[in-house]
Amino acid sequence: MELNPNHPACNHDYGLAITNHGRFDDALEHIFKAIKMDPARHRNYETILPLIYMAKGDGEGALKWVKEQLEYRPHSRYQGWLAAIHGNEGDIELAKTHLASFLEQRPEITNQADYEKVVPTICKDFVMQGLVLAGLPAT
């Protein structure tokens, strides 16, 4: 960063790196700086945002960015994350709906132990807590 603080990819990569140290607000600052400097590639830079917001325990921010990603690049992971977000936010019925959709799309995941194998480490606690609240069985 010291060599080229105005390079968008450097800001993005630095933001990713400092998430490993729990510096989520600083990471967001660098990622949003990359987006501002290189708006044509914003979708590439935004993919990490749902994870950072979940890691922060910010359900509202996570929900915004999961919906954005789901609209742009549909994938089963987003149904699981929506289940976790809504579970943590207390909307258990909606969490259960998203969990059912996720499990239908991912038959290899039947319980918490299965999901722990694929959950992103950065936001594991938030996601697992939300999925438990949504009703993902322990075994």
Language-model segment annotations:
Residues M1:
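Conserved short S/T/G-enriched processing/targeting/catalytic segments and their helical context
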Residues N4-T139:
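Alpha-helical protein-protein interaction modules
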